[in-house]
Amino acid sequence: MGLTRALASELGPDGIRVNAMAPGATVTEVPRESITEENLKAVVRETALRRVGTAQDIVGPVMFLVGPDSDWLTGQTLVADGGVTYA
């Protein structure tokens, strides 16, 4: 977060926006094979939405950050973690 803000301050005068994405636990085929069922259940319990994220859950926020709707944002870290941060 600090690096994102520092770079945004430094590069902003040149019209360069700097934002970051902070995804939570996201299961894809590769990690799914390496995580135990017990660990997966523990992650779900810690998530406000009571499920693990998927790659598709991350696509929307990323598309927002790279699209024109975020033209006024810089120095931000978008947390997409299903509510783990606040649960």
Can you name each region flagged by the protein language model?
Residues 62-63, 74-87:
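Short C-terminal tail/terminal secondary-structure segment
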Residues 13-16, 76:
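Active-site loop of short-chain dehydrogenase/reductase
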Residues 13, 25-47:
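A glycine/serine/threonine-rich, flexible loop-to-helix segment
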Residues 9-13, 71:
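Alpha-helical segment proximal to the catalytic Tyr-Lys
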Residues 47-58, 69:
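A conserved structural motif in NAD(P)-dependent oxidoreductases
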Residues 4-5, 59-62, 66:
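Short-chain dehydrogenase/reductase
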Residues 17-27, 66, 79-81:
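Conserved SDR Rossmann-fold cofactor-binding beta-strand/turn motif
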Residues 1-10:
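Conserved catalytic helix of short-chain dehydrogenase/reductases
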